[in-house]
Amino acid sequence: MVSSGMYKMDNGKPCLNNCFPAKSLLRLPEEGRGHWIVVRKGSMKKGAAKASTEGQESQKKVSFDTGLKKISRRDSQADVLGHILDRSFLLKHHSARKPSDLCTINVSGMKFSKAKEKDFKHFTSVIYINASENLLPLDVFHTFPVLKELELAFNGIKMVYVKYGDFKTLEFLDLSFNSLTEEAICDLGILPHLRVLLLTGNGLTSLPPNMAVKEQEASMTSLTSKKYILRFPALETLMLDDNKLSNPSCFASLAGLRRLKKLSLDQNKIVRIPYLQQIQLRDGSGDWVTEGPNPQKELQPQMWIFETPDEQPNYTVLPMKKDVDRTEVVFSSYPGFSTSETAKVCSLPPMFEILPVKSLKARNQTLAPPFPELRYLSLAYNKIAKEDAVLPAALFPSLCELVFHNNPLVAHTRGIPPLLKSFLQDRLGIRLVRKKLVKPKHHMLMPRKESRKVKTYIPKVPKHSLVPHHLNMITDSPPSSLMPEPEHSTEDTSHEALFANEGPEGPSLTHRAFVPMPPICSDSTVHSEAVSHQSHTAGLVSSEHPSDDDAKSTESIFLTQVNELPSSTAHRENLEAVNDQRRPSTAPRETKRTRRKQTATSLHNKYDGYEELLTVKPDPAFLEPKGIQKNAQALHRMLKQPLICRSSKPRLDTFQKPYVPKEKRAGRIPILPPRKTRAQLLDDILIRMRDPRNVTEAPLGTVLQRRAQQRLVNQKQYREAKRLLKEFRARYRQLVRSSLRTVFAASPPPRPPTRRALSAGQPKLGRFLEFMDEFCQEPTASDSKE
């Protein structure tokens, strides 16, 4: 064996390999000594031919000038060399050290046109590749050992070169928005584990008829026997939306896919679903029956023969008598149909070559339904306009959901069509979708940060007392039971001192506070106050922090409950009498005076403004309502309907608006003039025709204030305005003079003596006449010329 050594190639780069490979011990004798040289030269010639063709194409596209051909060729070569997908680029682009560390590859939009296939063998962990928006073919990626998902959208792929053994683990293939042909789709059928195939937007007008089955080539030993191989053995999802499929034969091409579960044919030109029925031929060769070798007869609709197997289906597809292009389903109960006959012959058009017998021979079956495992079929955005065009979907045994929204069938109607609802939905349980499903929006979940959580504890705000601070300072004094009553003079002096400290305007701003009026206390509060005066306890509760008992004791009363008030006052007087008996009888007169003052002040402070309620007598005709609800209702009724007697005296302190009665003005209906007859209308027209004068109306001020350039344009109009103004001045002067003469009763003497006499005798009238003469001056010569 020859050991490996260093050698240099034509480009000068060293390479660790054998310059002359070792001879194989199992080499065939037909090969000569220089066989490897011939193979090497042939590969070099093929590479040069490809490079020349690519250079010519790029040269034609870039420029048509002969002088720029060399520049364009250099640019194309540099561009190709710079956009080659290889091992070094993948490691650098994904920041990986070893090829085995890389699991996914994303090179979308990199404008790659070539790739080194040998470098991809080292990427033993790559299972997903996204190479969209490039110019790479499919066969470039066959050297990835464990590749499962491949996306090659927008790559301009037309043909596919795949061999047996390539893409052994590929399960997902996206070839959307390319330019695939029917042959390329057939070549994809040899992928053994392909489950999802996306062929969106490839401009397909039809599908290959042998898409599900491939006929194997006959060997040299057995020329008579034929074998068939299934294509797409593991395909479950097929997306053919956004194409140009219109022929119903596409269903016949796809019906042989035995494991297909989801089929999407959205945004095509499909008009109907054809009836699909398995057909078996008379002879066992697998070929269609023909009457002769004449090629013209092969183009005509062929005669298909139904053989009756052991298990006869309950329906049969027959051509319609009126329209040969359409078919109809005939069930076994149809009159004239007998299952005892050995064979049925019918002529169907070639486009309904439905489920050919080749697929049955591959699985050794005699009869198979169309789409045996299809569960989801989408026909949205097509041209289906009739209900019977969708009914053949009932022959698909595993169909669970049928989508047909945005079709003419449901564009102008509401609800599911009745025939489809009763036959497909109610009987077969197929879910029919006639409206586009709106996907719900994802719920936005805001992450909760523990740092933003409020953990501080805010203490409760204590309740403040209703009595202000300066009143607490005054009332903080020992109870009257512990110290003797002060004299009247001392009380006056204390009040005067307090008034002097606070000033005539009341307490200072720092001690002022909003003090609500205290409510009228009930007899319970009076009793509690009397008991508090009797208590000899030394501990007193401050006014700033009142106890709960004090807060509960301050309850309001209803003003209508006046029956208990006299008893409460009597009870209060009794308590005060008991307190007076306990006091020492040193000054009986002073105690009597203070007692009277206390009763007067207590009544005056508590019931200020409500003294009449203490002495009022109840109305004998008034029925006292029982219960708090009746009292509340009576009070609400009195407040809603108050009996107020307003005084007749006018209030002079307020501004009063005089009463002005409004007059109702009814609009007068205008009286239409009498309708003129046709003779009167003709007379008016003739009168207008006889009078050729054209009257032009224009404001006098605007005509006189125009500029010199505009005056030249309308010179006639300007002269007419000057003449009218001169005439107006003359008439106005004459009118003023005649009116003055009648007022002063003066004889009309000549003009100069009159002016002197008036100016001498009556100075005011003379000045007025001079003013009028100056105002009404005659136009000058320049104005008259103009």
Swiss-Prot record:
Biased composition, class Polar residues, residue ranges: 524-537, 554-569
InterPro entries reported for this sequence: Leu-rich_rpt, Leu-rich_rpt_typical-subtyp, LRR_dom_sf
LRR repeat residue intervals: 146-158, 169-192, 193-214, 234-255, 259-280
Basic and acidic residues compositional bias, start-end: 570-583
GO biological process: response to X-ray
Cellular component terms (Gene Ontology): cytoplasm; nuclear body; nucleus
Main location: cytoplasm
Keywords from the named record: Coiled coil, Cytoplasm, Leucine-rich repeat, Nucleus, Repeat
Coiled coil: 714-738
Record PANTHER family: X-RAY RADIATION RESISTANCE ASSOCIATED PROTEIN 1 XRRA1, X-RAY RADIATION RESISTANCE-ASSOCIATED PROTEIN 1
Name of the protein described by the UniProt record: X-ray radiation resistance-associated protein 1
Organism: Mus musculus (Mouse)
Lineage: Eukaryota, Metazoa, Chordata, Craniata, Vertebrata
